[in-house]
Amino acid sequence: MIPFCRTPEEGKECLRVMAEHGLDRAKDKTLKVYVMCEIPSNVLLADEFLDVFDGMSIGSNDLTQLTLGLDRDSGIVTHIANEKDPSVKKLIAEVVKKCNERGKYVGICGQAPSDYPDFAEFLVDIGIQSMSLNPDTVIKTLLLVAEKERQPKK
């Protein structure tokens, strides 16, 4: 997984360096390389990134910080650093849609699915393929997701 990849060209360079050191998808068809979707440019250029990578893992904490222009370590603005912000949700929905349309992997890591059950439901609704969870929320969230997936699609 490649973090903070700003451009598709930078992604190609990462893959070139990986291949130089023996991690080459052309030689190992089982090797999958994903890009972290943490920067608004990853969403805006999702198709171009998906031409380079096998999928995306959404880093919701960083994507929220960079979308809203926040210092998430500052106590002054932590109350507005929330993945449930409409602009952040719109970006997440867009990248999930693009990945699913292209048949590519898309998951999410970050606090939001653990902290907000309604956010986990949102992720199921938009077609997320996987989500990371804090250990103390796994069972509760798995039950919520299972119930949500049993419901008819709207």
Spans of model-derived segments:
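Conserved alpha/beta-domain cores
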Residues: 1-154
